[in-house]
């Protein structure tokens, strides 16, 4: 059995100095000798702590503007030396054992994210000595504790107090894992950055410099293991980005209910990202990653009521997302009316949570407020590869629209068109959305033929007794033939919004003119597969 190891000497060298003085003081008061470098050493000395500069310890000064500080046998021998095996040779060369290394690395990611960052700026923020110490300490975790996260400081002090100044093997091993994850992520960032410069430096034109690196290195942290994946015979886990700040299903806090399933997370993501499109109080109900009801109103209660009416059958067992706080009245309406898997909102009132708590199977997530959409990448796994693209954050405003028919849309039709265009972006292709008065009337999703999606949207509306006449229709891509317009006219659609771009646009526009339909082109497609 591995024994706890005492911590008598610690080397501290950090770029992010948050909490380091308090941590160093806690170590010092517990009899730990402090070694440090450069700015960290000065900070500790200014705080009145007894600290030995690494250059004084090694007898070798920092040089080359700080590029060489800790790359010395007395440092790495003290870290890598195996207690009980290398003691004699360490004593022979006056190498003192270092029991703890506290390091975080130069801020490479923050540097290259700054506007105007040059290659020289990036190069000077590539840490060499730091990762070397981190890897050395992690390799010798049997004897040495490596600390790379300030969030671990408090727990480490607590354990030292509980174990007479020692840390257990389990703790050292866990810290070593974090250390290797830390250096792997750091090296990945550097590789991605340099790889993204290849087009610029090699004269290639296949991709803009700074977008897609030659080799893509990804780092995600496991948030939870799952009972199973999309189906019960598939194992699964949920991984998240470490530094994500945007309100999302990945950063949401679950305040009620049993663990989220694989499908819960996928559907909740679809619902939340859709509801983010709206600035007014909105509700989105999703089933199998497709919106089955969306509405905007003066309150989330009314928005929910109207979204539910689009397709009550599909809403059963669905995911509900709001862009305002979940209040008690809305919570009561939901649990009284339907079975729901997940409710997600920026926040939830205490009274609302008391109501949802009566339904133990209802999962409630709060994700915080959002201000704007954050650019990023989307991934699609194919056998043997990975498709990577920008997130679809494309939006259109009234100023971007082109009316291509003889009849101009009314103000109401224009509002309805923009509303259902936002919804269509989140419906699986081929996608058709009927809407009127900021409420979806019918949604046709995922059909191989666009005209059948249009027909399904009409059937859905008819099944629920919703009046289609006078509604707007959105299509996520162009109409290849006029049949989709004929189908829309047959149920009373009076305005169509679509990207345009078909070789038969003239025929499609002529069909709209024949039926007296106003047609708007967005010149932007929203395929979703």
Curated annotation (Swiss-Prot):
SMART domains: AICARFT_IMPCHas, MGS. It catalyses: (6R)-10-formyltetrahydrofolate + 5-amino-1-(5-phospho-beta-D-ribosyl)imidazole-4-carboxamide = 5-formamido-1-(5-phospho-D-ribosyl)imidazole-4-carboxamide + (6S)-5,6,7,8-tetrahydrofolate; IMP + H2O = 5-formamido-1-(5-phospho-D-ribosyl)imidazole-4-carboxamide. It comes from the Bacteria. Pathway: Purine metabolism; IMP biosynthesis via de novo pathway; 5-formamido-1-(5-phospho-D-ribosyl)imidazole-4-carboxamide from 5-amino-1-(5-phospho-D-ribosyl)imidazole-4-carboxamide (10-formyl THF route): step 1/1; Purine metabolism; IMP biosynthesis via de novo pathway; IMP from 5-formamido-1-(5-phospho-D-ribosyl)imidazole-4-carboxamide: step 1/1. Keywords: Hydrolase, Multifunctional enzyme, Purine biosynthesis, Transferase. Disulfide bonds: none annotated. GO terms for biological process: 'de novo' IMP biosynthetic process. Residues 1-148 form the MGS-like domain. The keyword Cell inner membrane does not apply. One of its GO terms (molecular function) is IMP cyclohydrolase activity. Its EC number is 2.1.2.3, 3.5.4.10. SUPFAM superfamilies: Cytidine deaminase-like, Methylglyoxal synthase-like. GO terms for cellular component: cytosol. This is Bifunctional purine biosynthesis protein PurH.
């Amino acid at each position: 059995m591995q024994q706890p190891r005492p911590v008598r000497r610690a080397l501290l060298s950090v770029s992010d100095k948050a909490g380091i003085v308090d941590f160093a003081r806690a170590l010092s008061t517990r009899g730990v000798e402090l070694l440090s470098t450069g700015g960290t050493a000065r900070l500790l000395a200014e705080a009145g702590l007894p600290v030995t500069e690494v250059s004084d310890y090694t007898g070798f000064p920092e040089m080359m503007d700080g590029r060489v500080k800790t790359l010395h046998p007395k440092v790495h021998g003290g870290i890598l030396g195996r207690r009980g095996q290398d003691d004699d040779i360490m004593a022979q060369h006056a190498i003192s054992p270092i029991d703890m290394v506290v390091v975080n690395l130069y801020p490479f990611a923050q540097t290259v994210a700054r506007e105007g960052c040059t290659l020289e700026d990036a190069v000077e923020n590539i840490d060499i000595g730091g990762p070397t110490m981190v890897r050395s300490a992690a390799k010798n975790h049997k004897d040495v504790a490596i600390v790379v996260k300030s969030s671990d400081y408090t727990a480490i002090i607590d354990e030292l107090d509980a174990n007479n100044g020692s840390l257990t093997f389990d703790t050292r091993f866990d810290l070593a894992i974090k250390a290797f994850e830390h250096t792997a992520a750091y090296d990945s960032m550097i590789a991605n950055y340099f790889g993204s410069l290849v087009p610029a430096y090699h004269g290639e034109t296949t991709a803009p410099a700074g977008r897609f690196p030659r080799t893509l290195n990804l780092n995600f942290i496991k948030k939870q293991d799952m009972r199973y994946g999309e189906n019960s015979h598939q194992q699964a886990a949920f991984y998240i980005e470490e530094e994500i700040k945007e309100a999302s299903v990945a950063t949401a806090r679950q305040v009620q209910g049993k663990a989220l399933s694989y499908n819960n997370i996928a559907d909740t993501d679809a619902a939340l990202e859709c509801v983010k499109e709206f600035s007014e109080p909105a509700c989105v109900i999703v089933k199998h990653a497709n919106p089955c009801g969306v509405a905007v109103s003066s309150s989330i209660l009314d928005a929910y009521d109207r979204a539910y009416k689009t397709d009550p059958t599909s809403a059963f067992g669905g995911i509900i997302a709001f862009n305002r706080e979940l209040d008690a009245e809305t919570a009561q309406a939901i649990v009284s009316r339907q079975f729901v898997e997940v409710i997600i909102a920026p926040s939830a009132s205490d009274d609302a949570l008391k109501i949802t708590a009566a339904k133990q199977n209802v999962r409630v997530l709060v994700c915080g407020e959002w201000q704007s959409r954050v650019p990023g990448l989307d991934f699609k796994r194919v056998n043997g590869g990975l498709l990577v693209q920008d997130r679809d954050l494309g939006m259109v405003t009234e100023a971007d629209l082109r009316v291509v028919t003889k009849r101009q849309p009314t103000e109401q039709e224009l509002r309805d068109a923009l509303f259902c265009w936002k919804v269509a972006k989140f419906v699986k292709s081929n996608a058709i959305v009927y809407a009127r008065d900021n409420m979806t009337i019918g949604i046709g999703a995922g059909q191989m033929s666009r005209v059948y999606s249009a027909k399904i949207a009409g059937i859905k509306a008819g099944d629920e007794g919703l009046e289609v006449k006078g509604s707007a229709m959105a299509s996520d891509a162009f109409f290849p033939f006029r049949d989709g317009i004929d189908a829309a006219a047959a149920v009373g659609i009076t305005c169509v919004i679509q990207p345009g771009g078909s070789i038969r646009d003239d025929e499609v526009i002529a069909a709209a003119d024949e039926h007296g339909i106003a047609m708007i082109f967005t010149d932007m497609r929203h395929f979703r597969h």
